[in-house]
Amino acid sequence: MTVFFKTLRNHWKKTTAGLCLLTWGGHWLYGKHCDNLLRRAACQEAQVFGNQLIPPNAQVKKATVFLNPAACKGKARTLFEKNAAPILHLCGMDVTIVKTDYEGQAKKLLELMENTDVIIVAGGDGTLQEVVTGVLRRTDEATFSKIPIGFIPLGETSSLSHTLFAESGNKVQHITDATLAIVKGETVPLDVLQIKGEKEQPVFAMTGLRWGSFRDAGVKVSKYWYLGPLKIKAAHFFSTLKEWPQTHQASISYTGPTERPPSEPEETPVQRPSLYRRILRRLASYWAQPQDALSQEVSPEVWKDVQLSTIELSITTRNNQLDPTSKEDFLNICIEPDTISKGDFITIGSRKVRNPKLHAEGTECLQASQCTLLIPEGAGGSFSIDSEEYEAMPVEVKLLPRKLQFFCDPRKREQMLTSPAQ
């Protein structure tokens, strides 16, 4: 034993390196063990649903999964097969997995797809936007859009996951929670933006549209990968060297919020009234004047015009902060000031890369149900629509309130109902 400790003391550098390696290896193995426990617990919970008996005349639910293997730098397929696929197969659904090979394929497949009971998106913001656009471009979208949609966040940017699922620093737990939310069947209605250019078919977005200098600098962050943790600030710093001040001129016309119709009450079985009461009700409805038609006066839409000079413009839904008790439906138009300094541009821009919901001080926010954005000819630049790049052009943006039903964590849904957004 004395010789052993003497050897360690004489070779203290190797001993220190070996101890660090052993500690790291133990921590890595412990993390893998915890991930396996999370997967096992999720599979056992899904098995409970799979063991439930269904009526003889009922059919097994059909689920169609649109998997983007290229998401998360090519790791999405492995993440899905290890963390989500076993849960879906154990819960008793008939699962069909469609792997996309190129950008836009999910959009085309959905326009031709036959009916299914559940649509599942396994990917990031881009994959989700393709699926939503494919659903709402169908000729029978009025009925097809009623199919609930599940979202398994596998991409680098999965903005909607913060709304639908509880926050988690563990990637495995985040994916298993999202998959179990589909199994449990709780849904929430989400708004959709319809964005239509002059020539192309409309594009549909769940988060929103961004146009401006913060967006332009943010997409160049990966170009400075060799700077490590300084790459975000470097992208915004070099952006200020190319051109300053960076202003975007445009005009926007918009209409105000619309009143949210009351939710339909749940149907409850009632006892059929007697024949005498039914005859009286028929006579009363026959002789009554059609007051509803006379009382309903359609007020013309009031459009407001705004000329703007901004460093960035964003048109977003309220899906990131749902308020079930709200009496109005509207989208947010945020016009950020063009008077910020270079230092503030670098600081705020670096924060917006991690949290696009942040805005500079002095930002003007408007509420609208639809708007028309006109940009000067030759302005160039690009839009970001749900983190996907599109050529900047004049567009019409319309809010489709509570258009799609998305599966969400029951805990998150309960939290929305008990503490609505302010």
Swiss-Prot record:
Residue numbers spanned by region Disordered: 249-271
Renumbered residue ranges of the record's region Hydrophobic: 15-31
Main location: mitochondrion
Enzyme category, top tier: transferase
Recorded metabolic or biological pathway in which this protein acts: Lipid metabolism; glycerolipid metabolism
Membrane topology per record: Peripheral membrane protein
Catalysed reaction equations from the record: a monoacylglycerol + ATP = a monoacyl-sn-glycero-3-phosphate + ADP + H(+); a 1,2-diacyl-sn-glycerol + ATP = a 1,2-diacyl-sn-glycero-3-phosphate + ADP + H(+); an N-acylsphing-4-enine + ATP = an N-acylsphing-4-enine 1-phosphate + ADP + H(+); 1-(9Z-octadecenoyl)-sn-glycerol + ATP = 1-(9Z-octadecenoyl)-sn-glycero-3-phosphate + ADP + H(+)
InterPro entries noted in UniProt: AGK_C, ATP-NAD_kinase_N, Diacylglycerol_kinase_cat_dom, Lipid_Phosphate_FormReg, NAD/diacylglycerol_kinase_sf
Residues forming coiled coils: none
Function: Lipid kinase that can phosphorylate both monoacylglycerol and diacylglycerol to form lysophosphatidic acid (LPA) and phosphatidic acid (PA), respectively. Phosphorylates ceramide but not sphingosine. Phosphorylates 1,2-dioleoylglycerol more rapidly than 2,3-dioleoylglycerol. Independently of its lipid kinase activity, acts as a component of the TIM22 complex. The TIM22 complex mediates the import and insertion of multi-pass transmembrane proteins into the mitochondrial inner membrane by forming a twin-pore translocase that uses the membrane potential as the external driving force.
The protein's name: Acylglycerol kinase, mitochondrial
Gene name linked to the record: AGK
